[in-house]
């Protein structure tokens, strides 16, 4: 029994142990067998939403058998975006927010998504809704997408007509041809949100650039003018032509410091040094060589060659052998004086032809006759000159352009001159050298001849050249000098006057010289306000190329004004359309009032013009097929053009004239202090010709500016504002300038005057301006253009303050004098004169009693005035035989005329009914009346085609007819 009980107890204990072990296992399973999350991943790490949009994120917890996959959602900024516990995000406002999902099983894992919240654009705005560009110009359009925090800011640019206006992806537009295109910017969000700009491609006008060149060639360059012209064309003119520059070369002046070459084997007629001495007396130096030295002598260093008469036969033989060299030198711009009397004391005889001349040997002339007087050449000579063989021959052949001064007994020339290429030949067969040292009728002649031929020189010193160029109004002015002589010229005190001339014209000086003279020449350029450039002349081709580049650099800096022009401007139309364009012009004799800040004027609207020149013939509102490039009469012009039969745009421009500055300036020495007082006055006489009468005491001038600087040799000064003050020391040179501004804002050319405190007389300065380079003349009415009474403004002055006397001469193209007076010529001088160019010359002196020293005379100052015709309207004329009302029997006879004799090129017929409605229009053919019935008005206009002038339409002519035709 006990054994059985023991066995039961054992089994009970085993059962209890197993039961306890099972409970332990359950507890262990509860605490050690749960699966934790190892990672959490969101469906997005970045998200973009618009305001009020929603999106749902999902969170994946791994591993798949994780005991607890629950997550908790949160937002870093609940004001920007909210998130619920299902991961649904709601965008509340623009911004950036972080949405986070975190595990719930205690594993402390999380994952985040960055959400950027934006909003849709609601508008797009361009910087321009309308743009107007001339052909070839560019502009930038910019697009502003609103609101600024919009989701999409990129835009796409398009153009409605890429042949008219192009546009790139950045909004850069370019005008290609006349017309209009719509340029559109669209937001790239697929909603067709866009904005547009209407771009009109117009004919915005611009001034054609003008350049005037004065070129001086120093003979030290050892180059003849013909070769130099070729280089000038290659390196300078070609660049001007290629850029469509309106240019002139005023002159190509070859010069040297007064040096003559005498070629002789011995003095003529035992005259000793007479020829040499006479040349020296004229301020020239001479070199003397024999004929056999011609081949080894560089001729280009001389301005003149003098060949005396009476040489041995070997001399003339040698002369013939060097003929080609002498001919090339003369054609290149030299002056050759050939005293051709042979068979004298030395028995030589020249034969054949020499520079276009032949003569009859041994044709001795005891008498010669003066047939053309000259104040220098024939001074103190009798009309009929006799002597022992006054001439040793006559010229039997000579160039047709010769000017003959004297003839022999066969009425053949014995004294003549003629142009030969770019040079000049003066030849004569008198025994001048003999009578220069012996008595007789010819005694004065050699002195006269040398003085005449030396002063006749084709070249002048650099200083003289700069004093006399004729510049065109509104051009850029350039002086180009090549050579090494100038370095000495610019050291002279007279250069103060030259600087005044350069400043008056704002001229640029390009000095091509030896590097040894660089500092001197650069100093001169600096005195010219730096307007210029020094170039080393060791490589002439390279130097001229640099000069051309410099000129183009200056011209390319010139400012262009789109709506303000001067009467002398040439106007470019910047269009390149292949389509037909018609033009129409109207004009008012007034100017636009721009209400500029500097215009202290109470007037409103447009300002009427004083001294207007009337309405331009072409400004009649008629449509024409050619554009007008020159507006010779001031006023406000409206320019319209039709493109594909539609009026595209009107351009309104002002055409005016520059104001004119006036002042008087001189110095006077104080007797006590010895200092010099400076008197500057009369600036209130300055005026603007467009407003001088209607603007009270101002005379159209709203601003004025005085400046001065010292230009004494060795002094480098800059401009000082205001008038030159008194109390100046002696022996100083100054230039003073005045500029004035008119109501339109146009500044005048500077009026510059030279003032000196030197106790010596200075020659007065002759100078005047002209209101226009051309004067229209109505030849039908034998009258000048309206408003052209005063065409010149006198600007002459004397640096010492002396009173001046004036001498005015007007000559025609043939050298005939049409006016000679001490008074300035007016327009009436030119009434009834032939069309063409006239030279107006002024010379002054300070006589009879200047303050210091003897009376001095100014250099002559010359401007050219061109008389041009006025085109008159053609006259429309036709007759109608309306005896019959049947269309086929109505006869129309047209017989229009033009008062100037110009060809009529267009005839426009218009037929209107009794209500004014146009029913027929034809061009250059009679209207067909066959389909008409009733009362009609026939109107004819005709257009002329003058040469070199704008074409004009006639006034319309109308006639009424009755037609009984189709019903």
Swiss-Prot record:
Residues 1-29 form the signal peptide. Keywords: Plasmid, Signal. SMART domains: BID_2. Transmembrane segments: none annotated. Residues 38-107, 133-190 form the BIG2 domain. This is Uncharacterized protein CA_P0160.
């Amino acid at each position: 029994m006990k054994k059985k009980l023991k066995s039961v107890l054992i089994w009970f204990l085993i059962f209890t142990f197993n039961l306890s072990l099972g409970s332990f296992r359950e507890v262990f399973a509860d605490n050690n067998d749960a699966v934790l999350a190892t990672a959490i991943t969101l469906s997005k790490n970045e998200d973009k939403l618009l305001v009020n949009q929603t999106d749902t994120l999902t969170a994946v917890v791994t591993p798949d058998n994780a005991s607890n996959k629950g997550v908790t959602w949160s937002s870093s900024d609940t004001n920007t975006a909210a998130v619920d516990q299902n991961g649904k995000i709601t965008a509340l406002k623009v911004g950036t927010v972080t949405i986070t999902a975190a595990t719930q099983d205690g594993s402390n894992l999380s994952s985040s998504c960055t959400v950027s919240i934006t909003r849709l654009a609601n508008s797009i705005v361009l910087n321009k809704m309308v743009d107007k560009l001339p052909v070839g110009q560019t502009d930038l359009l910019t697009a502003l997408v609103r609101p600024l925090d919009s989701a999409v800011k990129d835009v796409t640019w398009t153009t409605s007509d890429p042949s008219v206006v192009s546009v790139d992806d950045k909004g850069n537009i370019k005008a290609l041809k006349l017309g209009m295109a719509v340029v559109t910017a669209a937001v790239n969000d697929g909603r067709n949100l866009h904005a547009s700009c209407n771009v009109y491609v117009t004919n915005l006008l611009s001034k054609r650039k003008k350049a005037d060149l004065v070129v001086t060639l120093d003979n030290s360059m050892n180059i003849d003018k013909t070769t130099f012209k070729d280089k000038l064309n290659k390196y300078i003119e070609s660049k001007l032509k290629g850029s469509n520059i309106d240019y002139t070369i005023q002159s190509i002046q070859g010069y040297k410091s007064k040096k003559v070459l005498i070629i002789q084997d011995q003095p003529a007629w035992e005259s000793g040094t007479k020829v040499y001495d006479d040349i020296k007396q004229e301020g020239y130096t001479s070199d003397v060589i024999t004929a056999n030295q011609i081949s080894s002598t560089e001729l280009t260093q001389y301005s003149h060659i003098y060949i005396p008469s009476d040489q041995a036969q070997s001399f003339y033989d040698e002369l013939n052998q060097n003929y080609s060299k002498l001919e090339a030198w003369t054609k290149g711009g030299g002056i050759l004086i050939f005293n051709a009397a042979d068979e004298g004391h030395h028995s030589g005889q020249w034969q054949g032809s020499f520079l276009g001349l032949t003569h009859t040997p041994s044709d001795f002339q005891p008498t010669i006759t003066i047939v053309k007087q000259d104040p220098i050449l024939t001074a103190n000579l009798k009309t009929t000159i006799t002597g022992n063989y006054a001439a040793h021959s006559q010229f039997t052949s000579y160039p047709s352009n010769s000017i003959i001064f004297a003839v022999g007994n066969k009425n053949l020339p014995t004294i003549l001159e003629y142009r030969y290429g770019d040079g000049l030949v003066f030849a004569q067969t008198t025994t001048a050298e003999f009578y220069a040292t012996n008595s007789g009728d010819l005694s004065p002649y050699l002195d006269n001849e040398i003085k005449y031929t030396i002063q006749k020189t084709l070249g002048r010193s650099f200083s003289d050249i700069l004093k006399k160029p004729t510049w065109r109004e509104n051009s850029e002015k350039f002086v180009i000098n090549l050579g090494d002589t100038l370095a000495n010229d610019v050291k002279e005190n007279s250069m103060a006057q030259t600087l005044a001339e350069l400043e008056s014209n704002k001229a640029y000086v390009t000095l091509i010289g030896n590097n040894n003279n660089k500092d001197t020449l650069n100093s001169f350029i600096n005195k010219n306000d730096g307007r210029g450039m020094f170039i080393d002349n060791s490589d002439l081709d390279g130097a001229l190329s640099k000069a051309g580049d410099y000129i183009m650099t200056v011209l390319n800096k010139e400012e262009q004004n789109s709506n303000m022009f001067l009467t002398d401007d040439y106007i470019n139309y910047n269009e390149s359309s292949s389509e037909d364009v018609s033009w129409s012009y109207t004009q008012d004799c007034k100017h636009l009032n721009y209400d500029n800040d500097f215009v202290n004027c109470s007037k409103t609207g447009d300002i009427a013009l004083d001294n207007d020149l009337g309405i331009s013939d072409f400004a009649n509102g008629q449509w024409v097929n050619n554009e007008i490039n020159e507006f010779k009469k001031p006023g406000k012009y409206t320019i319209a053009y039709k493109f594909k039969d539609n009026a595209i745009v009107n351009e309104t421009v002002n055409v005016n004239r520059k104001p004119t500055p006036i002042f008087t300036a001189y110095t006077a020495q104080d007797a006590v202090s010895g200092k010099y007082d400076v008197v500057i006055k009369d600036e209130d006489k300055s005026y603007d010709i467009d407003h001088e009468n209607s603007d009270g005491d101002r005379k159209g001038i709203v601003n004025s500016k005085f400046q001065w600087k010292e230009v004494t040799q060795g002094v480098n000064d800059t401009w000082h504002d205001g008038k030159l003050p008194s109390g100046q020391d002696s022996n100083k040179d100054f230039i003073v300038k005045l500029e004035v501004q008119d109501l339109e804002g146009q500044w005048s050319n500077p009026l510059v005057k030279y003032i000196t405190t030197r106790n010596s007389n200075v020659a007065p300065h002759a100078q005047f301006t002209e209101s226009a380079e051309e004067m229209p003349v109505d030849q039908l009415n034998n009258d000048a253009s309206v408003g052209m009474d005063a065409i010149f403004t006198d600007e002459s002055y004397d640096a010492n303050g002396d009173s001046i006397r004036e001498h005015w001469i007007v000559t025609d193209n043939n050298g005939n004098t049409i006016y000679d007076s001490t008074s300035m010529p007016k327009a009436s001088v030119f009434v009834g004169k032939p069309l063409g160019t006239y030279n107006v010359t002024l010379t002054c002196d300070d006589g009879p009693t200047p303050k210091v020293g003897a009376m001095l005379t100014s250099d002559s100052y010359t401007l050219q005035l061109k008389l041009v015709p006025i085109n008159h309207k053609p006259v429309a004329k036709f007759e109608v035989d309306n005896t019959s009302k049947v269309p086929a029997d109505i006869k129309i006879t047209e017989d229009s005329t033009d008062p100037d004799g110009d060809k009529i090129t267009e005839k426009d017929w218009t037929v209107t009914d009794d209500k004014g409605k146009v029913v027929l229009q034809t061009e250059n053919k009679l209207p067909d009346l066959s389909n008409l019935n009733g009362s009609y008005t026939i109107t004819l206009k005709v257009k002329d085609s003058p040469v070199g002038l704008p074409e004009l339409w006639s006034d319309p002519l109308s006639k009424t007819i009755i037609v009984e035709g189709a019903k």
